[in-house]
């Protein structure tokens, strides 16, 4: 239902692309429900205001000018959280002093955990947005609660299953690993990121019909209302591009010239860096597969090289018109194109949902954090992709051909199509994601404008009759 009186919601996104995109999509959803949306963002990776004329934007001084932010570091993330406290607090105070729309709440990305301190000081209700899968957060919390069970581990254990975390193995521990353990500063950061402080609820870019059992376990842990309203890129209507990088739309014209269900789309996201050896092995794996491909090689994504100069001699001549290389692509449009039959992906959560929603099966090449968990679920639980265990050209070639040409690949394509239909069903009127969105709107509308004293709201939006006891897709 739409609210009758105008209320404002302040969104505080984390600036990296994989976090910024779902927050802006959430903003579009909330705006469509009658809320005024204010985006308080860092100076780094400033969104394109012209793409979102329905929002009010406020730039916060993040104090990181001149610092290389192309790949995240703990120091930079902590500095960003500290530097943005005063700018956000001052802005919110000025908002509350002005007459006009009522400030309903602050919604913040879990990596911007400083917001909880600011909201608590001002006695404003806050809500956390989780931009990753429930399976990832569950694995993270399980390890954080008893790290001695999992860390450190021996090389001989890499392929052994993680206790209580099927289908993960020790090599899939979703933290940066150094000498077969996780440094304490990284564990401390993950504790801060997974905590919700005094926040009164959590919004999820996932679906009950995909992760019901994980969501129930996590809700028992956090004891606040959960609102799984994903996939937000589909729930948001007519969203303009949220990309920070310039998209090369000419690749769509190239796809138009390809046969239906023939092209492998290759993209490793907005942050991943690979070494030159991996690029060479990937290039020859693509070339030797004899399959048409669209390959995104982002500037700066190959250590020590810039885009095409890193490609092996003779590669472009060998593949000719069968391959197209771009610096960045309009991914949702690419995955929806009838020529695309597979996705060679890093398994970031946005890419995962976008691929499933377009019935595109995956070659899974994860690198870190949630990507490792997503890849295992995609390949072992949902069985809609094949995981690359070895980055070697013959293995890459065989995996691509298995996905694109084999009977096993046909089975994977059928499963991802079935998975899409269940997700689409959940977005219909009176179904799970749509109901959860209505509940979220009612919840925000009913929040007091000031909390005194600031305490979390306990209870369950997802009651036993609201969420299936066992999700079909998980079974």
Swiss-Prot record:
It is found in: Cytoplasm; Nucleus. UDP-alpha-D-glucose binds at residues 131, 329, 331, 346, 349-351, 354, 370-371. It is an enzyme of class 2 (transferase). The active site is at residues 19, 109. Its EC number is 2.4.1.263. It comes from the Eukaryota. Keywords: Cytoplasm, Glycosyltransferase, Nucleus, Transferase. This is UDP-glycosyltransferase 76E1. It comes from Solanum lycopersicum (Tomato).
């Amino acid at each position: 239902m739409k609210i009758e009186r105008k209320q404002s919601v302040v969104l505080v996104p984390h600036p990296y692309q994989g976090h910024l995109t779902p927050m802006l999509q959430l903003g579009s959803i909330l705006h469509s429900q009658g809320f005024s949306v204010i985006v308080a963002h860092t100076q780094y990776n400033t969104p394109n205001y012209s793409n979102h004329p329905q929002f009010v934007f406020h730039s916060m001084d993040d104090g990181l000018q001149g610092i290389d932010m192309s790949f995240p570091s703990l120091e930079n993330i902590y500095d960003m959280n500290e530097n943005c406290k005063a700018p956000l607090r001052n802005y919110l105070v000025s908002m509350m002093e002005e007459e006009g729309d009522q400030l309903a709440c602050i919604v913040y990305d879990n990596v911007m955990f400083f917001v909880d301190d600011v909201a608590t000081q001002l006695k404003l209700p806050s809500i956390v947005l989780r931009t990753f899968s429930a399976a990832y957060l569950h694995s993270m919390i399980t390890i954080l609660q008893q790290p001695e069970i999992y860390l450190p581990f021996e090389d001989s254990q890499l392929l052994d299953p993680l206790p209580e975390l099927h289908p993960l193995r020790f090599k899939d521990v979703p933290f940066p690993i150094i000498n077969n353990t996780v440094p304490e500063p990284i564990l401390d950061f993950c504790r801060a990121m997974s905590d919700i402080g005094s926040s009164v609820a959590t919004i999820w870019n996932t679906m009950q019909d995909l992760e019901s059992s994980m969501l129930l376990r996590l809700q028992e842990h956090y004891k606040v209302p959960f609102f799984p309203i994903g996939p937000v890129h589909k729930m948001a209507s007519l969203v303009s591009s949220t990309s920070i990088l310039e998209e090369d739309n000419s690749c769509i014209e190239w796809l138009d010239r390809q046969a239906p269900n023939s092209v492998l789309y290759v993209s490793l996201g907005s942050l991943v860096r690979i070494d030159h050896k991996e690029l060479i092995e990937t290039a020859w794996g693509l070339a030797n597969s004899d399959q048409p491909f669209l390959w995104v090689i982002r500037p700066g994504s190959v250590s020590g090289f810039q885009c095409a100069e890193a490609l092996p001699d003779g590669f472009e001549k060998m593949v000719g018109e069968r391959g197209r290389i771009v610096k960045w692509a309009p991914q949702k449009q690419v995955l929806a194109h009838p020529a695309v039959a597979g996705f060679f992906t890093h398994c970031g959560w946005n890419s995962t949902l976008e691929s499933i929603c377009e019935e595109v099966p995956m070659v899974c090449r994860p690198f870190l954090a949630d990507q490792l968990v997503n890849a295992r679920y995609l390949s072992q639980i949902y069985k809609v992709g094949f995981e690359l265990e070895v980055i070697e050209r013959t293995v890459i070639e065989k995996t691509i051909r298995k996905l694109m040409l084999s009977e096993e690949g046909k089975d994977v394509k059928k499963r991802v199509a079935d998975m899409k239909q269940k997700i689409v069903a959940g977005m219909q009127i009176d179904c799970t994601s749509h109901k959860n969105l209505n509940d979220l709107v009612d919840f925000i509308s009913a929040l007091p404008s000031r909390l005194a004293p600031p305490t979390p709201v306990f209870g369950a939006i997802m009651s036993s009759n609201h969420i299936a006891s066992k999700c079909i897709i998980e079974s």
